[in-house]
């Protein structure tokens, strides 16, 4: 939906630009104004009062969305032997070691999440330049470097997402699909915001959550009331 298209303008007209909506109201509006041609992703953009240039204010983490993401998550697992067997049984889409590394060195990155056992990280170092810029590098902090590969696969396929503030102090995440019930979208948003608030850096001063906008992939943004920090799925 182009910003210059008639459909976008009609969708934008349904939103009061001077109003801030409750999470549930915003979810309903975003559903109503999303493209009807496909099941659009519902995204949240959060402006934080942090300075990402400071290591102790680099907000990043993971959260399990209670209602999932609505996406089919393709998982690549770097493991061998018994752990490779566990990964296959848990539903990993791609499992391997050297052959996976070589494939990625050749430019292949047809997966959404990479998980690795600790003993494979030396090999993965050879493809860090490929995985890193795409946000695919396994990391102990996000639970993707682990010996419990079955649990990690279950979590990411069940709705666990990673988030990280960017250089402009903005944080972006997908919290569901336009086909989701509005209450489920609001609950997913609440789970994400709760975790972001929980890990607030102690050195961050002033207003922490400055602005929140909810939107579909190509639809107009709806500003969400940052003061709502509980009962996200209730009527305003």
UniProtKB/Swiss-Prot annotation:
GO biological process, one term: translation
Single GO MF descriptor: tRNA binding
Gene3D superfamilies linked: 3.30.190.20, 3.40.50.790
GO CC, any one term: large ribosomal subunit
Function according to Swiss-Prot or TrEMBL: Binds directly to 23S rRNA. The L1 stalk is quite mobile in the ribosome, and is involved in E site tRNA release. Protein L1 is also a translational repressor protein, it controls the translation of the L11 operon by binding to its mRNA.
Sequence similarity: Belongs to the universal ribosomal protein uL1 family.
Record-given protein name: Large ribosomal subunit protein uL1
Organism: Corynebacterium glutamicum (strain ATCC 13032 / DSM 20300 / JCM 1318 / BCRC 11384 / CCUG 27702 / LMG 3730 / NBRC 12168 / NCIMB 10025 / NRRL B-2784 / 534)
Gene transcribed to yield this protein: rplA
């Amino acid at each position: 939906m182009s910003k210059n298209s008639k459909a976008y303008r009609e969708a934008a007209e349904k939103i009061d630009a001077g109003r801030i909506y409750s999470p549930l109201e915003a979810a309903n509006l975003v559903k109503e104004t999303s493209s009807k041609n496909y099941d659009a992703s519902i995204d949240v953009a959060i402006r934080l009062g942090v300075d990402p240039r400071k290591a102790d204010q680099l907000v990043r983490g993971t959260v399990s969305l209670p209602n999932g993401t609505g996406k089919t998550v393709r998982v690549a697992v770097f493991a061998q032997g018994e752990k490779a067997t566990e990964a296959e049984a848990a539903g990993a889409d791609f499992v391997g070691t050297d052959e996976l590394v070589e494939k990625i060195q050749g430019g292949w990155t047809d997966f959404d999440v990479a998980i690795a056992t600790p003993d494979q990280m030396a090999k993965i170092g050879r493809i860090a330049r490929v995985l890193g810029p795409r946000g695919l590098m396994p990391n102990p902090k996000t639970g993707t470097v682990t010996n419990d590969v079955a649990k990690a696969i279950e979590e990411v396929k069940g709705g666990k997402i990673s988030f990280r503030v960017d250089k402009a102090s903005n944080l972006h995440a997908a919290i569901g699909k336009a086909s989701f019930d509005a209450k489920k979208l609001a609950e997913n948003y609440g789970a994400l915001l709760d975790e972001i608030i929980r890990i607030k850096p102690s050195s961050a001063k002033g207003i922490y959550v400055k602005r929140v906008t909810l939107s579909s992939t190509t639809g107009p943004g709806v500003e969400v009331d940052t003061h709502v920090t509980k009962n996200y799925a209730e009527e305003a």
